[in-house]
């Protein structure tokens, strides 16, 4: 039941241009056997189904709304059970995975604090610099604007330096 609703098979681009995964501006993550598609594809797949359900509701297409809402609910459950471990860790210990789980409110209530803790740990380990790719950097900014609780994140976004890859 879980694997069926984790859209993580076949070719997936995942997140790319993560500074720590680049070498002189060339993205190296595609060469890795396990890349960010382990979390990007399932989470953005869930988001697409959620958007479809919301759109169907706006258009008054009740049967389509129920259909996509059911898929989105099953996908959210699969993400919570199959991607987020008991300690709130994601399949790849990348900042972007935690950003998406927080921003899309996919974490079960009992794991929200530990997921936020993993994100803060990753930021601290990286010298208070962000290490997110093009998919999650925008989400980081949008989330920090809406949440006064992301003061560490705001500090990392305002840094004038970068530590890895093409941003050296």
What is the predicted role of each segment?
Residues 1-168:
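Active-site core of glycosidic bond-cleaving carbohydrate-active enzymes
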């Amino acid at each position: 039941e879980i694997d069926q609703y984790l859209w993580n098979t076949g070719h997936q681009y995942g997140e790319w241009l993560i500074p720590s995964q680049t070498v002189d501006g060339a993205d190296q993550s595609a060469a890795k056997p396990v890349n960010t598609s382990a979390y990007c594809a399932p989470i953005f797949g869930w988001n697409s189904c959620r958007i479809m359900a919301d759109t169907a509701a706006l258009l008054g297409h009740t049967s389509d709304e129920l259909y996509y809402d059911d898929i989105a609910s099953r996908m959210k459950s699969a993400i919570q059970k199959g991607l987020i471990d008991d300690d709130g860790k994601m399949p790849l210990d990348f900042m972007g995975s935690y950003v998406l789980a927080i921003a899309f409110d996919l974490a079960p209530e009992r794991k929200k604090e530990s997921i936020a803790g993993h994100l803060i740990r990753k930021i601290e380990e990286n010298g208070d610099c962000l290490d997110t790719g093009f998919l999650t950097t925008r989400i980081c900014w949008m989330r920090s604007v809406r949440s006064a609780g992301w003061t560490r994140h705001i500090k990392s976004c305002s840094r004038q330096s970068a530590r890895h890859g093409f941003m050296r």
